[in-house]
């Protein structure tokens, strides 16, 4: 079916490999061979996940970067030259609904800022969360609190911090009994880390992996923050032109 609509390349990853572990050359080659057996090509890796400890500069950062370099080298040996990654703390792309219905009968991913604010203020109960929203938005949150059901609350939690993050080897999995508690702990890892500190951690990471990219001709492609504004009190890394300009000059390398 994909070939029938003109698709030539596939964007995928080794989703079964835990975040931070090495992608074995054999596993990469096996998936590549499978894709090519259907007359397609593995064009882009999305994503080779960057571990949280790399982002917040934890004590295991250097070992995790070494693992990342080995994975990059193995991708290069398999002939895969484009790797997408992101440097968003804790939470990657955010949606409040994975199957939002539309009038024509179709459905799509959806981000509802009021429902997200409800998650932040009422469910997560993040300290100082109210400062990130307007008076009108907070009023809408209070109105939502009068009608939202427990099932809808549970689905909102599941969507924001389990289902969407599972696509990118998230830290919280299906079946975890206390996802909100785990999520709060992950957020706390970034206490005291501002935009400048996150930038320096990204620079450190890129400087470390560029020699491997040079050797194998791999291009590292960063995914912009999604959505491109501050969420949950976390620093952001690629929200607009100024961030992109910083990134292009932070590491002097074409890859």
PLM features: residue spans?
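Acidic/histidine-rich catalytic cores of soluble enzymes
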Residues: 134-255
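Hydrophobic or amphipathic alpha-helical targeting/insertion segments
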Residues: 61, 67-93
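Acidic, His- and aromatic-enriched active-site or binding-groove loops in soluble protein domains
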Residues: 68-70, 101-133, 238-252
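Active-site-proximal loop/turn and secondary-structure-junction residues that shape catalytic pockets
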Residues: 16, 48-49, 87-91, 224-230
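Surface-exposed, active-site-proximal loop segments in enzymatic domains
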Residues: 19-22, 48-66, 91-105, 184-193
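Conserved, mostly hydrophobic/aromatic
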Residues: 2, 10, 35, 75, ...
């Amino acid at each position: 079916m994909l070939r029938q609509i003109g698709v030539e390349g596939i964007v995928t990853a080794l989703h079964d490999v835990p975040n931070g572990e090495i992608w074995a050359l054999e596993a990469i080659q096996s998936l590549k061979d499978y894709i090519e057996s259907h007359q397609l090509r593995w064009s882009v890796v999305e994503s080779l996940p960057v571990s949280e400890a790399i982002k917040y500069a934890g004590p295991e950062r250097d070992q995790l970067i070494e693992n990342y370099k080995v994975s990059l080298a193995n991708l290069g040996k398999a002939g895969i030259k484009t790797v997408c990654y992101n440097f968003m703390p804790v939470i990657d792309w955010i949606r409040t609904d994975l199957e939002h219905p539309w009038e024509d009968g179709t459905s799509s991913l959806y981000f509802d800022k009021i429902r997200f604010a409800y998650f932040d203020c009422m469910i997560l109960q993040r300290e100082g969360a109210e400062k990130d929203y307007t008076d009108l938005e907070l009023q809408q949150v209070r109105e939502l609190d009068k009608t939202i059901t427990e099932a809808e609350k549970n689905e909102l939690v599941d969507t924001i911090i389990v289902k969407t993050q599972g696509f990118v080897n998230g830290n919280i999995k299906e079946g975890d009994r206390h996802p909100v508690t785990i999520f709060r702990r992950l957020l706390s890892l970034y206490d005291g880390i501002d935009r400048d500190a996150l930038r320096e951690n990204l620079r450190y990471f890129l400087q470390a992996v560029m020699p491997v990219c040079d050797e194998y001709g791999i291009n590292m492609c960063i995914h912009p923050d999604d959505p491109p504004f501050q969420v949950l009190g976390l620093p952001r890394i690629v929200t607009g032109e100024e961030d992109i300009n910083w990134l292009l000059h932070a590491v002097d390398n074409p890859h």
